[in-house]
Amino acid sequence: MEDYEQELCGVEDDFHNQFAAELEVLAELEGASTPSPSGVPLFTAGRPPRTFEEALARGDAASSPAPAASVGSSQGGARKRQVDADLQPAGSLPHAPRIKRPRLQVVKRLNFRSEEMEEPPPPDSSPTDITPPPSPEDLAELWGHGVSEAAADVGLTRASPAARNPVLRRPPILEDYVHVTSTEGVRAYLVLRADPMAPGVQGSLLHVPWRGGGQLDLLGVSLASLKKQVDGERRERLLQEAQKLSDTLHSLRSGEEEAAQPLGAPEEEPTDGQDASSHCLWVDEFAPRHYTELLSDDFTNRCLLKWLKLWDLVVFGHERPSRKPRPSVEPARVSKEATAPGKWKSHEQVLEEMLEAGLDPSQRPKQKVALLCGPPGLGKTTLAHVIARHAGYSVVEMNASDDRSPEVFRTRIEAATQMESVLGAGGKPNCLVIDEIDGAPVAAINVLLSILNRKGPQEVGPQGPAVPSGGGRRRRAEGGLLMRPIICICNDQFAPSLRQLKQQAFLLHFPPTLPSRLVQRLQEVSLRQGMRADPGVLAALCEKTDNDIRACINTLQFLYSRGQRELSVRDVQATRVGLKDQRRGLFSVWQEVFQLPRAQRRRVGQDPALPADTLLLGDGDAGSLTSASQRFYRVLHAAASAGEHEKVVQGLFDNFLRLRLRDSSLGAVCVALDWLAFDDLLAGAAHHSQSFQLLRYPPFLPVAFHVLFASSHTPRITFPSSQQEAQNRMSQMRNLIQTLVSGIAPATRSRATPQALLLDALCLLLDILAPKLRPVSTQLYSTREKQQLASLVGTMLAYSLTYRQERTPDGQYIYRLEPNVEELCRFPELPARKPLTYQTKQLIAREIEVEKMRRAEASARVENSPQVDGSPPGLEGLLGGIGEKGVHRPAPRNHEQRLEHIMRRAAREEQPEKDFFGRVVVRSTAVPSAGDTAPEQDSVERRMGTAVGRSEVWFRFNEGVSNAVRRSLYIRDLL
């Protein structure tokens, strides 16, 4: 050992202290130089080393010679080598080469996994701690039998320091072990050995340490394990491809069987070997196939089926079955309810009347299209498909949101309802289902309406619908008459594009699914898929998804794909699968703001005990939330999902003062008004300066109202109308001001702006327009009263004001100021000043009209007067008698100014007949007979026409049609 320790002088101290015992064992194993009896060399050319000794011996060729082992070796080591040489049979072990020096380089290249070993002992530890290798007798006792050939063959390689003492102070190199720590803190290592008496253990015991199963494994995984893993992956890949192929063949076969299957035949249940659920959605797999499997409302199902059956006469040629007469009691009751005053018919009664109504002249229903409306996920599309197949149609589905072009929309509708493809699979007529019709533009809806409004023949034969005999060229150009039913599906029936369609459609409101029926269906799905779920848990899932069938089934499939075979309430609360971003109604948002939630009605999706579900909008931090915090987040989410913030704020403003206020000092009202002002400031800043990042704060206004005014009482909420009324009144006031300003004289308008009139002048002007006048004739007025009346008339004409007579709903006549500037400057709640009497207003109105005519005649006289010597018009009074050319003519009358072009054609005076020389021709008149009255009539008409030119009364005939009350009036009565 001394020579051996001298040769290790170049090795680090920590390595020597850690592997001292192992290095000594390796040196003793390499020291056996006894030649093998067979004389076969240890290694063969070209063969890689397989054992630890071969790896050490292979390094001899490349290493330099080292001095032999020291003579002072222990006698125990020599005796061990002699026993090992005696135990080896002939030809079992090859002759090892002569040892030159310890192969430290080979030892360094080996992975002893030092990170798993204990810290090396201190250098001054006693060498007696090293456990010597076991003797051959110990090996024989260990295996329970004498030295056999196989045991002798493996004796040298299986020698281990733990053979004599299984408890080691250092981890073994070539064995699997476990470490144990005593109560005093001493670490010990135990070697793992298999049971030698068990079948198949000896082979594994011989090969595992040396074939990659022990600590000398370079890859970490044996080659056999790698091969087995690769084979398993290849086998799994082949199984998946075979499963896909079988699923494809199964789907094709099921489609053919469904097409060839007669109506109402039961479907075959899939076998257990077909794991179709792992490759398809459960929503499609468990979708209803028959009428009896539907979960929707029975009344809705029957109404849609009855409407489809109304097409049987046109599509199938089947006569409509006659209805059985109802008992005599029920019609009397219905008629009594219908004839009751103020009794409105229910929606069900209206639908029944529409279905019982007769057909149109073309033997089609009066409503050519059915419109299903309701929230998403309730099964509207499934209902349309099942009902159409149940009625004997082949369903053709199109999505209106995808085909938004009007031409494409028309082509798809005509191809499904009028072309040769009206016969679908199996010779069945088509039924067109248009999904998401609320997403179609107005132009596409107009195309659908034009197809629905095409008129057919008015005469129908007894054998069925009559075929147009002639004149069908224009109808064929339009596309022909609609002879197939169309079912439209929408989520929002109040979309602007559906206003015209709803008036002609058979409207069906899709109610929510009953929770009991939905829970039963979900339990059937979970049982068939091997998933355990309690009915209470499924009810919680239905409540979380608002009874959405699609969301519930998709949530179950998602949890099942994650390996959950048992569903609990905590899983339902923690998951967010199935939640949809759906816009809430305005009334539901206002109800959420003004009413406190019930204690037992706890939202499933907002459990405060879950750290990942404290808020629907984000993950949030862990911790519990109080009830006030939950209400805060719930109202905030409802306000953010409403989508119409202005309408929400208007509803809050119109309804918060109608609630039961608990604050007698109205402090909550003041705080609410401050929040409303803050919301207006945010909206103005966001839209005027385009600071749209401020729009994240307005949803907090409903939260503040909830904190201030929420109570347990059910609020009476009305739709907001104050904003619309204020806008209408504002536009009315602007029109009044514009009308007033446009009628003011230019001299007055130049000194009065609209704002100055509204704020300063109009209030005082109303006092000026209400003088104290006696309700008597103007001839009885004094000079002062006449001047006051003339000033009043002049002021009203300057501001274009007058009094108009109107009739009130009671039948009384009043005079109202026009334009009514009193509405601009006086509030309706304030007491009005003492108004003028009816006679006074009538007198003022008459004087205003007379003054208007006087001014109009004066202006017309000035305009029509001729110019004298180039002097401006209006100076004829000054220059009337001056000059030879000055001619003074009387001003034309009022009717002459308006009908001047007519007066030119009329004869003013009867001119005497003259001859060629200008002499008046005198004709002799014959005496008329007694019965001849025609000349007298002619003379009367001639005199009448002559008098028309001199008369002050004119009339004008207006062509057209009038429904007014008329009476015969002769011209002679006017003259």
Swiss-Prot record:
Gene3D superfamilies: 1.10.8.60, P-loop containing nucleotide triphosphate hydrolases
Keyword Phosphoprotein assigned: yes
CDD domains membership: AAA (cd00009), HLD_clamp_RFC (cd18140)
Region listing for Disordered, in residue ranges: 30-83, 114-141, 246-276, 320-346, 858-896
One of the record's GO cellular component terms: Ctf18 RFC-like complex
Residues annotated with Phosphoserine modification: S64, S225, S871
A Gene Ontology BP annotation from the UniProt entry: DNA replication
Subcellular location: Nucleus
Keywords for this protein: ATP-binding, Cell cycle, DNA replication, DNA-binding, Nucleotide-binding, Nucleus, Phosphoprotein
Phosphothreonine found at: T51
The organism's place on the tree of life at top rank: Eukaryota
Biased composition (Pro residues): 122-136
PANTHER family: P-LOOP CONTAINING NUCLEOSIDE TRIPHOSPHATE HYDROLASES SUPERFAMILY PROTEIN
Family: Belongs to the activator 1 small subunits family. CTF18 subfamily.
Full protein name: Chromosome transmission fidelity protein 18 homolog
Gene: CHTF18
